[in-house]
From Swiss-Prot:
Gene designation: PRSS16
Record's signal peptide: 1-24
Annotated GO MF terms: dipeptidyl-peptidase activity; serine-type exopeptidase activity; serine-type peptidase activity
Cell compartment(s), UniProt: Cytoplasmic vesicle
Protein name per UniProt: Thymus-specific serine protease
Species per Swiss-Prot/TrEMBL record: Homo sapiens (Human)
GO terms of biological process kind: protein catabolic process; proteolysis
Amino acid sequence: MAVWLAQWLGPLLLVSLWGLLAPASLLRRLGEHIQQFQESSAQGLGLSLGPGAAALPKVGWLEQLLDPFNVSDRRSFLQRYWVNDQHWVGQDGPIFLHLGGEGSLGPGSVMRGHPAALAPAWGALVISLEHRFYGLSIPAGGLEMAQLRFLSSRLALADVVSARLALSRLFNISSSSPWICFGGSYAGSLAAWARLKFPHLIFASVASSAPVRAVLDFSEYNDVVSRSLMSTAIGGSLECRAAVSVAFAEVERRLRSGGAAQAALRTELSACGPLGRAENQAELLGALQALVGGVVQYDGQTGAPLSVRQLCGLLLGGGGNRSHSTPYCGLRRAVQIVLHSLGQKCLSFSRAETVAQLRSTEPQLSGVGDRQWLYQTCTEFGFYVTCENPRCPFSQLPALPSQLDLCEQVFGLSALSVAQAVAQTNSYYGGQTPGANKVLFVNGDTDPWHVLSVTQALGSSESTLLIRTGSHCLDMAPERPSDSPSLRLGRQNIFQQLQTWLKLAKESQIKGEV
């Protein structure tokens, strides 16, 4: 693989799926920061578009039905897509389709990641499809509640079907060309489900860090965070895990003390909002949990402000006399480092301000759509991270009921309806036993989301790959000399799996079966 291409292999969408409150904002910014850092690093190489260099990808628009399940509703919207045809061998070559998730897609979506990296080997056409209601693919009427009912994973998959048919006509793609879907995080789930629901149209899929099991109370997230903080393989330790608990206990003590202690805490931890009310205290504690969880989720990724090893060093007073530091001081320093890296002044806001922001129907043209993704968590997935398990090192204050209240406050959706929606999602897609073949599920055991994915093969044609010490979508990140042997082997396995699939596709082409 050429050096310049390796530098462009940034994560396709490294945002968190955690769809609530301050945690959502912080993890979203962490993911965007990492992606932007990797893109700017590639640009810093001084790459030009001279002879032999990559051509700029093309952007296009597809007219899609707003409600394809209602034959009497002919309303439509424009869905953005990107195309990289630099390596395409023509009509019979494979199509690598990168599916967008809960954010906007730019030209980098077809210039980096698995599809672009693997395209030269097989002469593939690389296409990315932006998810409805995100980025610039927002229907008329914007983000009003009446419109959001047309936002769902099922409708997104219907868009994939119609896009495949329309793009085949537009680019004169042979009916025998195999279409292979790629995606990371929520988009990884979409990639797996596209193969599950439409095997006659999607030949195979690579699903990276795909949380295919919806869950209301996602306490398992912090179970993985706790284990990772103790993992010596990534710089954790029992001492580090204990220090996190001590630091959070000190934060809660100061919150209970009120007065000067609470005022000092607000300043030291950059809480932009009053801390007198329990709901605002939960916002701060949730943001602190997200900060530590984000360090674990993105551990080892280029551009991440802190690694687990570095965080543990801060909490344990590394680099100096430990008696001159406390876990709370280390946590405060971690907050400063992360906020500085993100160019952000506030770690948390008041609950009232958070609700007001999420009620805004003004579309976000870049990054993650917070209102849209919250709606999808309320109507399909849940994913509400809690700390009710005794093994959790954080605070129990950001409890599930207070999180579910946000669905009611913003969208008027009851806790019961959210629970029912989560159950329906698992019933429709099959949860962690989807039953799809020709799907490769790729996960890292450090990533808190891997517990919602498929990590054990359910059959000979439903493969899994678990990368030791791997974080969220790490297999999609830029190749580096410091990559672990398990990550290098994982990428080789992805290449080999794709090679096997495309050999099968070629044999089917010869037999006229594709």
